[in-house]
Amino acid sequence: MMNRRAKKLSLLCLLLAVALMISACGRQQPVSSGTNNELVHSSYPVTLRIASGSENKELEPLLARFAKDNRISLEMHYKGSVDISRDLGLSKVPYDAVWPASSMWISIGDTGHKVKYTESVSITPVVFGIRESLARSLGFVGSRVSVRDILGKIQSGELTFCMTSATQSNSGCSAYIGFLYALLGSPDIITSESLQNPGLQKDIQALLSGVDRSSGSSEWLKTLFLEGDFDAMVNYESLILSTNEELDKQGREPLYMVYPYDGLSISDAPLGYVDQGDGKKEEAFLKLRDFLMSREVQAEIQRYGRRTGFEGILPENKEVWREAWGAQTDTILSPIRMPDSEVLWEALGLYQTQFKKPSLTAYVLDFSGSMRGGPSEQLKGAMAEILLQERAAKNLLQASQHEENLILLFSDELRKTEKAAGNVAIEDLYRTIERESPAGGTAMYEALDAALDQLAAYDLGQYTPAIILMTDGMANGNMNLNDFKRSYESKGGGIPIFSISFGNADLDALGELAALTHARVFDGDRDLVDAFRKAKGYN
């Protein structure tokens, strides 16, 4: 919602976790992992395929310069760090280099020791960015702030914030582990036993109850904040700084950065080469590494709001970190110690099933005649990955006992509506979908309007709500897009509609829905199952 406002899973299962593909938000185009055209040149003799966190998209001007000067194509694939870690565990890694947000994802995923020449390109802490006037009223301006200080303001109803999913994005994961560490009293290391502490569980649930919008991407969280009306967000310092630059241009109130002193986590942006025996690619990678690590380019990277050493900021770049925004440039960063991989996965499993704010999701699914055959079978297969809990657990998308799920199946009318509370009855929804056969037209807006009515029956403040629409065609019911926009706004708005496009879906209309509701469009043509996983990762 917008405002100014289980037990331990097996390590083997969780190592298959799939996070969301990450890319910049295009209003009228489905999300993909495509790269900037300035980086790819078919005439260049060597192409490096790089799996990268979305936060590195801001550095594309530097990468484009390198590509042009060295005649090396850079094919950037923006993905979640957990997804990059998973790819490193494959027998054939589909990339020449990886650039996740944190070294821990290489350490966890690279069991075959394929990655070499790893270098930390920059570092950035994960911080709170809070509207300056609110931060001042909370007493945070100019103060040392602890995680418990923040928890107190959430419990008093004074603070809500946006944050990426801990199971889908490194910034969310890092912040979450920092919260756990601080709430446990800054132990030497987080253990499996400490995660079962009743006091910790109560506190972390209370803290995460303050999340009013979730995201699967750190870069898109910035976009969401700029387009919406929110009090605060947890994100990389570099993205808070670039958000403030945009807010400054728009004449809007900036965010004040708060660095929780007892739960600070750091992204170290490691770039590593995946050794698959190609000498030309290895040579090209080393040129890229040397370029990024050169003194000149490191200074340029600082101008993007990224620190290039734990010792602080170069004097000529101090203006990027404005004191009025709460930037701490003279303080030595003291990050928390991350838990070992098994405890990390257990913590993420608990986040998904017990700790995070429960999801409230309405799946609005197209069963019109054009979905006959392969399309409907793909849809059923995709929903199996979300609703059948053993499969969902492999992707860290399993349901919690307090979440609510609805399905609305439509063609030329709303054919079926069904609800399921918790993480057991949810599988009954899949069986209903499995029995459905496509026929008829596409009354898409009527179905979406019905979903809004269904969700209005819930106390939305207790959930992270979302509508996930899947369609393969043009709406041809009695309600048109403008009719739906009026209805959406009259009902208060605030519920994002994430669309999955398939076949002949009307991308312009889906893009307008995304813009209206501060959501995204995902491309289901390449892989419908993966598109549903991505969309679900946003709530």
Feature names for model-found ranges:
Residues 435, 471-523, 533-535:
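VWA/integrin I-like adhesion module and closely mimicked acidic/polar interface patches used
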Residues 34-168:
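N-terminal segment of the mature folded domain
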Residues 356-419, 427-470, 498-509, 530-531:
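Von Willebrand factor
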Residues 27-33, 309-362, 369-377:
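Acidic, polar low-complexity linker/tail segments
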